[in-house]
């Protein structure tokens, strides 16, 4: 049960965390992102829409910003004004900056395998590089990269053979029931999530099914690497022993990484500077119904958490020590 005021013990101190509904009436909200012009967008994964929830409130009657998307997931703005969204069921990455009917909007990349989460790194002279999580099979995922500059955009596999597990039938398109739901759900919210660490030249990778978080610096790794090789790489693994992970976000001012544990209904804080086993780490927030994504207000004082099961984005205050 979700309590509006929760008492959380952190470092021997007890503090109060306030949890309130910020936006509601959403259909399976799965991912959020801020645009450079200050809009907070949310993907409605099974509804095929992206909505602007900047002002909060009842979103059920508001006209969607974009519609006719096929399983919209991660949203990621780029330096050149694009607003990219991963279409998981459509196998594409679409630029939704123009809004409206997604079938008429430009595709950055197609023929991908269940693209789900996105991260963008600026690699200097080569410009921005997009990293995408894909489903290589029902039980394996991979991280693929492609250039956003005036270079070859052919997707190239980067991290291979990352363990995963299938999701739930209710998070798949109706045409997949009952025979193909496992194929679609493999690219659902049990996939591996990535976060670009607020432009620090590396990204974090959550291997959700194993409760692990890695720090990925492409300059320190080979052009192509497997999950088993990554585990053995020094200083890559920053957290383990967690429950199944969903979305996460780096909090710049505190240096902490906040991640959701959907099946536990919790948000947990991880300190990447102190790698370790976080199995017994108390959550920052508990009692949520299937939380999938976390973002912060532009002043970093408030946390927003998607709750896909009840169609609500929650606003959390007091989560910082």
Q: Model-found features: residue ranges?
A:
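A short helix->beta-strand "capping" segment at the edge of beta-propeller domains
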Residues: 2-25
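Short loop/turn segments immediately following the C-termini of beta-strands
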Residues: 45, 88-89, 135-138, 208-209, ...
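Beta-rich, blade/repeat-based domains predominating
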Residues: 24-39, 67-83, 87, 109-129, ...
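Beta-propeller domains
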Residues: 42-57
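A short beta-strand motif characteristic of beta-propeller blades
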Residues: 18-23, 60-66, 103-109, 154-161, ...
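Structural signal for beta-propeller blades
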Residues: 48-51, 91-94, 138-143, 211-214, ...
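Short loop/turn segments that connect beta-strands within beta-propeller blades
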Residues: 53-58, 96-101, 147-152, 217-222, ...
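Tandem-repeat architecture and repeat-register "anchor" residues
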Residues: 29, 53-56, 72, 96-99, ...
């Amino acid at each position: 049960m979700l309590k509006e005021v929760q008492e959380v013990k952190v470092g021997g101190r007890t503090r109060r965390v306030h949890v309130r509904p910020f936006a509601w009436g959403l259909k399976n909200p799965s991912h959020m992102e801020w645009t450079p012009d200050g809009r907070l967008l949310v993907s409605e994964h099974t509804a095929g829409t992206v909505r602007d929830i900047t002002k909060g409130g009842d979103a059920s009657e508001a006209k969607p910003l974009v519609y006719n998307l096929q399983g919209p997931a991660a949203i990621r703005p780029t330096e050149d004004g694009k607003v990219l969204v991963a279409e998981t069921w459509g196998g594409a990455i679409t630029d939704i900056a123009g809004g409206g009917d997604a079938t008429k909007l430009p595709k950055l990349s197609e023929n991908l395998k269940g693209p789900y989460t996105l991260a963008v790194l600026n690699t200097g002279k080569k410009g921005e590089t997009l990293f995408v999580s894909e489903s290589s099979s029902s039980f394996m995922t991979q991280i693929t990269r492609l250039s956003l500059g005036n270079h070859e955009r052919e997707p190239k596999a980067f991290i291979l053979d990352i363990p995963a597990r299938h999701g739930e039938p209710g998070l798949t398109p109706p045409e997949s029931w009952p025979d193909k739901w496992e194929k679609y759900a493999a690219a659902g919210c049990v996939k591996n999530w990535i976060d670009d660490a607020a432009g620090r030249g590396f990204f974090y990778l959550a291997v959700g099914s194993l409760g692990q978080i890695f720090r990925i610096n492409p300059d320190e790794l080979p052009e192509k690497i497997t999950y088993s090789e990554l585990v053995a790489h020094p200083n890559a693994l920053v957290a383990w022993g967690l429950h199944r992970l969903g979305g996460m976000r780096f909090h710049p001012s505190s240096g902490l990484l906040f991640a959701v544990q959907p099946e536990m209904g919790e948000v947990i804080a991880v300190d990447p500077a102190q790698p370790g086993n976080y199995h017994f780490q108390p959550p920052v927030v508990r009692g949520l119904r299937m939380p999938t994504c976390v973002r912060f207000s532009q002043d970093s004082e408030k946390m927003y958490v998607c709750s896909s099961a009840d169609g609500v984005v929650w606003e959390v205050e007091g989560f910082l020590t």
